A protein has these predicted regions:
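Alpha-helical transmembrane segments in multi-pass membrane proteins
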Residues: 7-63
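Functionally important transmembrane alpha-helices
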Residues: 19-25, 160, 179-205
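Membrane-interface helix caps and helix-loop-helix hairpins in membrane proteins
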Residues: 170-178
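Alpha-helical transmembrane segments
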Residues: 6-21, 81-89, 159-163
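Structural signal for the C-terminal ends of transmembrane alpha-helices
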Residues: 58-68, 194-197
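Juxtamembrane helix-loop-helix connectors linking adjacent transmembrane helices
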Residues: 34-41, 65-133
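Membrane-interface helix/loop boundary segments of multi-pass membrane proteins
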Residues: 136-161, 190-203
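Membrane-embedded alpha-helical segments of multi-pass membrane proteins
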Residues: 43-55, 119, 123, 127, ...
Length: 205
C-alpha cells in the first residue's frame, strides 16, 4: 500500500483536493443535508473537512512526505520569516481592501453572522475560523499540495499551485470573481512561501 501511495502520490493529492473543494459541497447541498439545523450543517462541514485532512495526513505519512515537513525545530530566522509573512499578509489585506470590492465569500459570511446563536456561534465565530480552519487549510494546501508538486519546485510550481488552489477554494462556492481570486491567492502565496522557507507545516499554521 505504501509503495502504491508513493507511486501515485500526485494523483491521490488531486483526488483529495477535488474532494475538499467540490465533493463536500455537493454533499452539503444535497437532499441529505436539507433538513439539518444550522449547527448540524456547519458541524457536518467541519467533520467532512476533517475526514479529508485525516486521509491527507495518512497519505503523507505512508509516502514519507510527512516526515519531511514535520520538523518542530525552532530557529530565530523562522520566527523572523513568520513575522514578515504576517506583516505581508496584513499589508496585502490593507491594499486589497482599498483596491478591490469586498469578496463574495466575506459578504456571505457577514450575512450569516446574525443567524449564529448558541453552539453555532462558538463553532463559526471561534473554533472553525480560528482553530480548525487554518489547520485544515495548511494541511491540504501547503502540506499535501506542495509536497505533491515538489518536483516542480525549481520553477515555483509548488508555491504557485498551492496559492492558486487556495484561491479557488475560497471563491468556488460563491461565484468565480477574478478580484476575489487574486485576494485569496495573494494570501495563499504568502503562506506557501513561508512553508517553503521553513520546511515545516507548523509555522504557516
Amino acid at each position: 500500500m505504501k509503495k502504491i501511495i508513493s507511486r501515485y502520490y500526485l494523483f491521490i493529492a488531486i483526488l483529495l483536493v477535488i474532494a475538499d473543494q467540490f465533493l463536500i459541497r455537493l454533499l452539503l447541498h444535497s437532499d441529505l443535508a436539507a433538513g439539518l439545523s444550522d449547527f448540524a450543517y456547519y458541524l457536518s462541514d467541519m467533520l467532512l473537512n476533517f475526514l479529508v485532512v485525516l486521509l491527507a495526513f495518512i497519505v503523507m505519512v505512508w509516502s514519507g512526505k510527512w516526515q519531511k515537513i514535520n520538523s518542530r525545530k525552532f530557529k530565530g530566522s523562522y520566527l523572523f520569516y513568520s513575522f514578515l509573512a504576517l506583516l505581508a499578509f496584513v499589508i496585502w489585506n490593507f491594499v486589497t481592501f482599498y483596491l478591490f470590492p469586498p469578496t463574495k465569500n466575506e459578504i456571505a459570511y457577514q450575512l450569516d453572522i446574525p443567524t449564529f446563536t448558541g453552539a453555532t456561534a462558538f463553532l463559526m465565530y471561534f473554533f472553525y475560523p480560528v482553530v480548525a480552519g487554518p489547520i485544515f487549510e495548511e494541511m491540504i494546501y501547503r502540506g499535501l499540495v506542495m509536497t505533491a508538486l515538489e518536483k516542480g519546485k525549481k520553477w515555483g510550481l509548488d508555491v504557485l499551485g498551492s496559492a492558486a488552489l487556495f484561491g479557488i477554494l475560497h471563491i468556488s462556492n460563491h461565484g468565480w470573481v477574478l478580484t476575489d481570486f487574486f485576494v485569496y491567492m495573494g494570501g495563499g502565496l504568502i503562506f506557501a512561501v513561508l512553508f517553503r522557507v521553513t520546511k515545516s507545516i507548523y509555522w504557516p499554521i
